[in-house]
Amino acid sequence: SATSYSGPAAVRLLRASCGQLSHTNLYQPSGADCYLFENLAKLGFNQQLMLGHNGLFGDFLKELRSLGGMQSPLMDQTGLPVSLQAFDGSPVYEDLAVLNRWLKTEEASSNPRSATFYNTLPLHDGNHFPGQSKTADYKVRAQKLFDDLDNFFTELEKSGRKVMVVVVPEPGG
C-alpha cells in the first residue's frame, strides 16, 4: 500500500481487489467487487474483524465499514487486558490476549475457512502505560509486540490450521 497513515492503508488493503487507487479515489464510492473481504466471503471464508483498540479515533472503525466494506461485527473486547493507553486516553488491548481470543473462537467454529482483519497500535506515538503520562519507551513496546506475535504464532502453528498471516506495518511501526 502506498500510503503513510493507518486509515488509508487499511482501506487500501480492504479494497485490494481493485488495485492501487489514488488517494482521492480512495474516498469515493466503490463497487462491491473491490472489497477483498466480500470476495473472500463469496469463496466461503467467514469474515472477522478485530481491533487492539476501540476504533473511535479518526473514525477508524467507521472508515473500515464505509470505505473498506468491512461489515463484520467487531470481535468482543469485553474483559481484555489493557496494556497501554493511546495518546487520546483510550485503551490499547494486549495483543496476545486479543489474538488468543480469536484463536479460541476459530477452534470452536465449524467453518474451517476464515479471513480476519486485525489492526493494532501498541507502537503508535503517544501511547503510555496506564497511570502514566510519559510516552512509553518504544523499545519496550516493540519487544512486547514481537513477543506477543511470536507466542501467538507458536500457538497458531500448534493448532494445525492452514494460515496465511499478512503484516502491514504503519510508519514508525
Labelled PLM ranges:
Residues 1-130, 140:
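Active-site-proximal alpha/beta segments of enzymes that process anionic O-linked groups
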Residues 144-173:
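Metal-dependent active-site segment of extracytoplasmic phospho-/sulfohydrolases and closely related
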Residues 127-149:
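Active-site-proximal segments of metal-dependent phosphoesterases and phosphodiesterases across multiple
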